[in-house]
Amino acid sequence: MSFNHFDDQGRAIMVDVSGKQPTLRTATAAATVSMQPDTLADLLAGRTTKGDVLGVARIAGIAAAKKTPELIPLSHPLAIHHAAIDFDTDQACGTVTVRATVRAFERTGVEMEAMTSAAVAALTIYDMCKGADKGITIGQIRLLFKEGGKSGTWQREEGQ
């Protein structure tokens, strides 16, 4: 196994992608936010003191995709062509699954943009609901799918 973010002397570098051809790159990532079922019921019914939690989280996630190189030092600045956030809720369990999809016509993948997008949307949900529920947790930030480029398509298997 090799890590390509290091040179021969072990120093951190940004990977040189200048020789690659741009291709359509897509990645989908997810993050899970767990809270009390009553907190989720209030969130979904619009009974929070901070407004439209999922609407704000959606905008935060989209903005985060565009800001990824400012947060992840060795990621490449990319021209993001599409960023979208979707939410799946399970009221009985009190969970919100954030799903972020990012697309770009680039020389390198958009996995980090999708993961950052999902994570920041989840953090925004936490921030906007923490006053009502101190026990909220964020977990399972994960890549679900990627395609484009030399490595082709990858999809997480169910339960993985």
UniProtKB/Swiss-Prot annotation:
Substrate binds at L74, S75, H76, M112, E113. Pathway: Cofactor biosynthesis; molybdopterin biosynthesis. Its EC number is 4.6.1.17. The active site is at D127. GO terms for molecular function: cyclic pyranopterin monophosphate synthase activity. The keyword Lyase applies. Homohexamer; trimer of dimers. This is Cyclic pyranopterin monophosphate synthase.
